């Protein structure tokens, strides 16, 4: 039970959150769920409560999850060798079966169950359900020694999104459900494709013209060359940071995904620290936030 001082603190926090609740009621927020937030028990529970809270105050949260470490664990237990090219898991037919078992099965249903235990009404699905996410094989190339025509590398069932059925998501959100999406797409021939979860989240946000795209990470946010978190950026500033090499390496694909979403109609993208309990609520309902905000400033003038 709260004492009087703590009760006053809670009341003050709720009062400060009210303008944000009013502003975002009825809006759609797409959250890419991954990193430590998916493995730490306290963070898993705080994330589930955050998502339920959003729904209760009138926001439409949509969760897209990863599961790379869980896939790696099962492949190891099954003695299936796994390799990566350009950061992408080479996914032959045997590996794809494991990817579907992990992403569409255990990981997806664990998230659904956790949200439901906290009072939500979550429904899990993959892109194969009702052909919800269509995909094609991702073409990966690398330079050849003579620097002529690049070599095409076959990395198996790794795909890129070609389409997202908006009607499937709106059917669920209109029924007060919380969609929980595993990043598996289906090709024209019915083949399954393993797709990067950041890319799926970005495309879903674009199709829905979402208010926000939130990418949970294991870092404090996008940092400058001095290691300081950059809290607010325009798309033009992000382009400049990519050009001068400030954004590089493993963070580059994530930032490019967020940048593309904002340039294609999403109101804002957020790179947030998923290691912080209730990170999503802090980012939405407080002035301070817990990461980097990328806004559409300048997009509409281009």
Swiss-Prot record:
Native organism: Hahella chejuensis (strain KCTC 2396)
GO aspect biological process, one term: arginine biosynthetic process via ornithine
Name of the protein in its database record: Acetylglutamate kinase
PANTHER family on file: N-ACETYLGLUTAMATE SYNTHASE, N-ACETYLGLUTAMATE SYNTHASE, MITOCHONDRIAL
Its job: Catalyzes the ATP-dependent phosphorylation of N-acetyl-L-glutamate.
Gene Ontology MF annotations: acetylglutamate kinase activity; ATP binding
GO cellular component, as recorded: cytoplasm
Gene name tied to this protein: argB
Keyword RNA-binding applies: no
CDD domains found in the cross-reference section: AAK_NAGK-C
Broad class of the protein's primary localization: cytoplasm
Family of this protein: Belongs to the acetylglutamate kinase family. ArgB subfamily.
